[in-house]
Amino acid sequence: EKLISYGKSLGLDAYYINNVFQTILEDSVLNQQAMLQKNLNPEAMSETHRVAYLGGQGSYSQLACHKYFSRRPGKVIEMGCTSFDQITGKVESGQADFGLLPIENTSSGSINEVFDLLQHAQVSIVGEVTHSVEHCLLAMPGTELSHINKVFAHPQPFAQCSRFIQGLGDIQHETCDSTYHALKSAVETPNSAAIGSAQAGKNVGLEVVKSGLANQSENHSRFIVVARKPLQVSKEIPTKTSLIMATKQQAGSLAD
């Protein structure tokens, strides 16, 4: 309240002041948790971390990777992959130390392909990170919305921007293995566009035609970090436990 009162005297918005304060607190807590984990798992804190994720430069997975590993000491070696299977495969084989997998989104819900994969992959969940997703329609410089006749995207952005896509009418939609591949396809295909972040588009020479495409204004994706071996977790850190259960296909089986 003191901060808000003082901020108002300087002409600052109360909502803005509260957001900055909450961000500082969250950052402090996350740094403390990272330090506790470092002390408890010194063997996992090597000089380099090989991280496998979906897509390439500018993909949401890469941005989430930067956000999570920025709190860990050492250099991050990025390993862009073309499928979720490839990510877990690199972790299981020892080619990667960690894998980053999107598991749910506030607009499109759970990513079932990842849940199915976790039933068979020999990996352990060792962390998570939530990243804000801001979908934009991206095209080559000078391209107008009325000139676009084809849109490329990963299935998740298509689902998260379904209302916008429906509003485009008869424009063709083509799904890609990753947002990175969608962006490259838009670069190579005349009068086309892709759905991705503004930064991702900039990396490959695309410009924003329209922003704010998601069905929900607050659009976030939650990613899990997986490794071959589980990590010890400090008792001072609130944790989650993920369980996979199989039940009979009959009424009441979940309650039983």
Regions found by a protein language model. Give the residues of each.
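Domain-level signature for soluble enzymes in the chorismate/prephenate branch of the shikimate pathway
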Residues: 1-256
